[in-house]
Amino acid sequence: MNIRYLARNNILTLKPYQSARKCTHSGNIWLNANEFPIAPDYQFRYKKIHRYPTCQPQEVINNYAYYAGVRSDQILVSRGADESIELLMKVFCNPGKDVIIFCPPTYGMYKTTAEILGINYRIIPKKENWQLDLASIKSQLNNVKLIYICNPNNPTGNIIHLNSLKKLLKIIQNRALLVTDEAYIDFCPDASLVRWLPMYPHLVILRTLSKAFALAGLRCGFTLANPEIIKLLEKVIAPYPLSTPVIDIAEQALTPISIQYTQNRIATVNTNRNILITGLKKCSCVQQVFNSHANYVLVKFNPKYQVFKTLLHQGIVLRDQSNQPGLVNCLRITVGTYNECKHVVSVLKKLHVASLSI
């Protein structure tokens, strides 16, 4: 029996999302997944793992609501922000009929999730300055239900102009939802749209504990939206989205003292990012270093140096972004520890075109 005949056609042709961990399995310095380089120290407290956990842990929700400056009924907690991306499509998009929009270069899971669910998508590239092409979006809103905007944008690191986002919210009012993916917003909180939630009922914000909170392995994210949207999402979320250990660690991570530790981590990352950018600009193999408001830096390299391959041979793992529109010869470098940033710069400064033979 050929099992493939039983599979959905869109799955047979699906190109799965290539996570940073899938792409590379070996290395000593991991600067490819935008993780915090040092693990926080939390201990598992709950012993009664013979019971199912609650679907929406109230202490986690209440503490994150306080941190984010919203009400508890405006929050859904999920298995990372990736699950939120999927839940929104399940609730608002009819397969084969409705459409989502995303604007590359950007995070790849918007496209992959739509393809898995059989949701049509419309690609509207950003302008050369990586800002939104509002005119093109406005002219292509037919059947659109969701517009996904990553801010700060991954992998470019830039902030989408708030004025553009406000204009977009007005353009799509009574037509679609704007979903702003704020996975990296903790590194530039002034750019958050969270204060706009009371004014725009069609605004949805995605958050995570993976980046600034240094808990990528936990898989815990949040959807911030008006209560009506949250109630709809609760209809389709799994009955036990978070395991008891995840709930336990998330509760600990959102206490006042832990949030202060997170703020200290953010300050360290921002300092190291500036050190990394300054050093990269002095490397002859670098053609351009793009400004960043997140925990990573996008860099365009001279292709003659084969930087990705050369550094990988030395145990330094970066993320190749060359397959994204407008990002030929670009690599994304996660901001690591001070020593990691200095080491990467030191290695890059020593590169010569002769390194092609490596």
UniProtKB/Swiss-Prot annotation:
Give the molecular function GO annotations. Answer: histidinol-phosphate transaminase activity; pyridoxal phosphate binding
EC numbers listed for it are: 2.6.1.9
What chemistry does it catalyse, as a reaction equation? L-histidinol phosphate + 2-oxoglutarate = 3-(imidazol-4-yl)-2-oxopropyl phosphate + L-glutamate
Taxonomy of the source species: Bacteria, Pseudomonadati, Pseudomonadota, Gammaproteobacteria, Enterobacterales
Disulfide partners: none
Note the coiled coil stretches, chain numbering.
Answer: none
Query: NCBIfam families under this entry?
Result: hisC
Recorded name of the encoding gene = hisC
Instruction: State the family named in the UniProt similarity comment for this chain.
Output: Belongs to the class-II pyridoxal-phosphate-dependent aminotransferase family. Histidinol-phosphate aminotransferase subfamily.
Please name the source species: Blochmanniella pennsylvanica (strain BPEN)
Q: Which cofactor does it need?
A: pyridoxal 5'-phosphate
- Is Transcription among this UniProt entry's keywords? no
**InterPro entries tied to this protein:** Aminotrans_II_pyridoxalP_BS, Aminotransferase_I/II_large, HisP_aminotrans, PyrdxlP-dep_Trfase, PyrdxlP-dep_Trfase_major, PyrdxlP-dep_Trfase_small
- Pathway given in the UniProt record: Amino-acid biosynthesis; L-histidine biosynthesis; L-histidine from 5-phospho-alpha-D-ribose 1-diphosphate: step 7/9
Tell me what this protein is called. Answer: Histidinol-phosphate aminotransferase
How does this protein assemble?
Homodimer.
Which residues, renumbered to this chain, carry the PTM N6-(pyridoxal phosphate)lysine?
Answer: 211
A Gene Ontology biological process in which this protein takes part is: L-histidine biosynthetic process
Q: Which UniProt keywords apply?
A: Amino-acid biosynthesis, Aminotransferase, Histidine biosynthesis, Pyridoxal phosphate, Transferase
**Transferase among keywords:** yes
